[in-house]
From Swiss-Prot:
GO terms for biological process: NAD biosynthetic process. SUPFAM superfamilies: Nucleotidylyl transferase (SSF52374). GO terms for cellular component: cytoplasm. This is Nicotinamide-nucleotide adenylyltransferase.
């Protein structure tokens, strides 16, 4: 079985992520999505919990017509040592042969560890980024809903995501400031 790893934070998942998974599954039997920075939540850069992101990803992929039996989603907490992070990913994920990433540093780590690394398939990269989605939510601009699957927008609304981001923007929840 040919498996690929697709790491990301998915804060929140958007249509570009759905496109990437669909394209990856054209080349492999199964994709392992690692939800990174799993220990962070309720802060501006990482407002959603790992569980919420897994929920959003599953619903987004389902909405995108992706066969969830070919997808494994696992949370991966960050560690301060990058090689330890790599080891943690390898220990938490089923065996994989290929890594898809748009992050040059992640690509370097996996290449040096002997993995085949491929460029993450991109779709409308100028518009589709989780950072942009969070910025639009924070501004109260309803255009953010066009960038994510309807299921993701519904989850963000159901959990009070806009209010969470507004409060996170105050900076009181940033652990490094305590």
């Amino acid at each position: 079985m040919k498996r690929a790893l697709f790491p990301g934070r998915f804060q929140p998942p958007h249509w570009g992520h759905v496109y990437a998974v669909r394209e990856i599954l054209k080349e492999v039997d199964e994709v392992i999505i690692t939800v990174g920075s799993a220990q962070f939540n309720y802060i501006l850069k990482d407002p959603f919990t790992a569980g919420e992101r897994i929920w959003m990803l599953r619903e987004a992929l389902r909405e995108g017509g992706i066969d969830l039996s070919r997808v494994v989603i696992i949370p991966v907490p960050n560690v301060e040592n990058n090689l330890e992070w790599l080891g943690r990913v390898k220990s938490l994920a089923p065996p994989f042969q290929i890594v898809y990433t748009g992050n040059p540093f992640v690509a370097l780590l996996f290449k040096e560890a002997g993995y085949e690394v491929r460029q993450q398939p991109m779709f409308r990269r100028e518009q589709l980024s989780s950072t942009r989605v969070r910025e639009l939510i924070l501004k109260g601009d309803p255009q953010w809903e066009e960038l994510v699957p309807k299921s993701v927008a519904a989850i963000i609304k159901a959990i009070g995501g806009a209010e969470r981001l507004r409060i996170a923007a105050l900076g009181e929840a940033e652990p490094h400031k305590w």
